[in-house]
Amino acid sequence: MLPLCLTFLSFFLSLGGSFKAVMTKEEADGTTEAAACLFWIFNWTVTLIPLNSLVALAISSPTFFGDKPNGPIFGAKAAEAPTSPPTALKYKYLTSFGSNFGGILTIDLSFYWALGVALTGSK
């Protein structure tokens, strides 16, 4: 029989996969940097995403919707090499307080603030 702490730890890790799998998923999305110190974990993720995914209907030309263009075309006469679409950086900062397994316990401080206001009668 395993001790209770090891049983809980193995159950906790089996819920969403291993911590290494989570880090691998984050690396697939973008660049992840993680730093851990005593009871604090800082996690920074920078993702390079296409700019048009942030804007609704970015491709809204009549040609895209199936219209046939009429009139003169003022484009380039020679074929040009394709370029990459415009991109934007997306930053995500995560600070976890607790153990090295991430923020297991989340404390909603607004509840305690409202409770303190109700008990003391001050605003």
UniProtKB/Swiss-Prot annotation:
UniProt-annotated location(s): Membrane
Protein keywords: Membrane, Signal, Transmembrane, Transmembrane helix
TM segment ranges: 39-59, 101-121
Signal sequence bounds: 1-24
Main location: membrane
GO cellular component, one term: membrane
Membrane topology recorded in Swiss-Prot or TrEMBL: Multi-pass membrane protein
Comment field (misc): Partially overlaps SYF1.
Protein name: Putative uncharacterized protein YDR417C
Species of origin: Saccharomyces cerevisiae (strain ATCC 204508 / S288c)
Phylogenetic lineage: Eukaryota, Fungi, Dikarya, Ascomycota, Saccharomycotina
